[in-house]
């Protein structure tokens, strides 16, 4: 690869694509999973959240493991882990075992995700990194686009279980090619032990908070089953912050947040991706349960979002590089909020041209305006030496926002129990859910410290040689929707 061979690049791209496709297809399969297991909405939430929880909690820690012990080694270990967990998911006899297997699958995703781009950065000559990063970004976008098609077809034609089983042959190809073509690399300048305590504190803390937020609607927010996990989780997260302040090799360098621009960019990221996750979690279920869409129809309903982002995201990132990200980071969330408000108009008829398409088109336009400048603003706020860590932190903030949103928004709008199985009730509750999400995105548009460019320099470039927006635009995009096509 150092001589320009591209086989290793394709291996890492395929690894990233495997996790991306898996994330997009699960949302399409939720109604089928619920029917097979007679599962309530809380259990379906945990099918999604258990994966996101371990992925978000361990992502930064797994990145440090690759830097210390070898990126190829950790990447391939993550692929094996992910594949074995996928096998258990595919044969899960109950919702409880599926949820547990999804949590284990998230650990594998955390192990392989950081290495997928880091291997390219470390293995290619500087002159080749831009091209390699572009291939990585482009195929990630393709994976995001085909995931809903593949998931909808598998669920409709065969079984939801195949969305997990399909990972096994893909993983076998990755391992066989990776052993041969991916070179080993590590950061020889690192010393000391990895931040194991930090990884445990943040993961268990997020678990406690998430569990309490999901348990609240069923048993009451002030009752011990909901209140105690939230309190314990919050205390553990506070301990995590205190630990990171004094750790010799912290998993999360808190010094990054000394920059007001970096902090503001991540606040806006949290708001935008919280609203995004709520939309992408609910809409496939709503279209199938309320509007009568088949799984494949629901799977391709968000295709306009992907298309708009593919066409406009690079242009939005280039504009932010010229004029600074303040305008787009302020206007974009307002457009997202408008699109989310239109989701509330989608009813039992589910007419694609008059109800679904306007909502997803405006929603996608807002994402295209916002996402790339946000990433650029976060990277511009730090030195080039910390660009990789800043990118990882921003990505982790997006995933944590998705976790919290899926836990909170359904309960806040009354979507509990088996409401999703009753179209009339689900339609009314989902309208409240859609109406609540613009409140997540709108504060981002009015954030008083909207990210602004650093006068002395343009937004920093990622170490891979490509601009930041090229490999971020579609990372956390998970889910799908449509009218009768």
Cite the ranges covered by each PLM segment.
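Membrane-interface helix caps and helix-loop-helix hairpins in membrane proteins
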Residues: 95, 159, 186-191, 216-222, ...
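Interfacial helix-loop-helix linkers and transmembrane-helix boundary segments
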Residues: 66-67, 71-73, 129-132, 188-194, ...
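12-transmembrane solute porter fold
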Residues: 6-21, 26-28, 41, 116, ...
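Transmembrane-helix bundle of Major Facilitator Superfamily
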Residues: 1-180, 316, 323, 341-344
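Intrinsic disorder in cytosolic terminal tails and internal cytosolic loops
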Residues: 1-4, 188, 450-485
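Alpha-helical transmembrane segments
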Residues: 80, 201-206
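Conserved aromatic/hydrophobic "specificity hotspots" at molecular recognition or selectivity sites
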Residues: 160-200, 248, 258
């Amino acid at each position: 690869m150092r001589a320009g061979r591209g086989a290793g690049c394709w291996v890492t791209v395929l690894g990233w694509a495997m996790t991306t496709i898996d994330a997009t297809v699960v949302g399409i399969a939720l109604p089928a999973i619920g029917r097979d297991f007679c599962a309530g909405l809380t259990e379906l939430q945990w099918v999604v959240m258990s994966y996101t929880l371990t992925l978000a909690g361990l992502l930064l820690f797994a990145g440090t493991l690759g830097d210390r012990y070898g990126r190829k080694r950790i990447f391939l270990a993550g692929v094996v882990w992910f594949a074995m967990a996928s096998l258990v998911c595919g044969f899960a006899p109950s919702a409880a075992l599926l949820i547990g297997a999804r949590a284990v699958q998230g650990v594998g995703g955390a192990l392989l995700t950081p290495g997928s781009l880091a291997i390219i950065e470390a293995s290619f000559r500087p002159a080749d990194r831009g091209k390699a990063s572009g291939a990585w970004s482009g195929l990630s976008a393709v994976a995001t686009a085909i995931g809903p098609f593949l998931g909808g077809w598998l669920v409709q034609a065969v079984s939801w279980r195949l969305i997990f089983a399909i990972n096994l042959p893909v993983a076998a190809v990755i391992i066989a090619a990776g052993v041969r073509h991916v070179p080993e690399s590590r950061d020889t300048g690192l010393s000391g032990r990895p931040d194991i305590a930090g990884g445990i504190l943040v993961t268990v803390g997020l678990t406690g908070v998430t569990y309490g937020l999901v348990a609240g609607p069923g048993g009451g927010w002030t009752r011990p089953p909901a209140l105690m996990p939230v309190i314990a989780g919050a205390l553990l997260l506070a301990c995590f912050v205190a630990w990171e302040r004094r750790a010799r090799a912290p998993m999360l360098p808190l010094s990054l947040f000394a920059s007001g621009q970096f902090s503001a960019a991540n606040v806006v990221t949290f708001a935008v991706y919280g609203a995004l996750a709520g939309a992408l979690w609910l809409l496939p279920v709503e279209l199938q349960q309320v509007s009568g869409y088949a799984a494949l129809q629901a799977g391709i309903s968000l295709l306009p979002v992907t298309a708009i982002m593919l066409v406009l995201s690079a242009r939005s990132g280039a504009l932010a590089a010229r004029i600074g990200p303040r305008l787009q980071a302020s206007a974009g969330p307002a457009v997202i909020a408008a699109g989310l408000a239109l989701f509330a108009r989608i009813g039992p008829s589910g007419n694609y041209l008059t109800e679904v398409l306007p909502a997803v088109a405006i929603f996608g336009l807002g994402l295209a305006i916002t996402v790339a400048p946000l990433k650029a603003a976060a990277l511009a706020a730090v030195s080039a030496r910390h660009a990789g860590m800043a990118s990882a932190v921003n990505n982790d903030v997006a995933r944590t926002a998705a976790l919290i949103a899926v836990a909170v928004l359904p309960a806040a709008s009354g979507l509990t129990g088996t409401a999703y199985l009753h179209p009339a009730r689900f339609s009314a509750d989902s309208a409240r859910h859609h109406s609540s999400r613009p409140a997540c995105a709108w504060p981002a548009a009015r954030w008083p410290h909207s990210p602004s460019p650093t006068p002395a320099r343009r937004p920093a470039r990622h170490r891979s040689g490509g601009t930041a927006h090229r490999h971020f635009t579609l990372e956390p995009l998970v889910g799908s929707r449509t009218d009768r096509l």
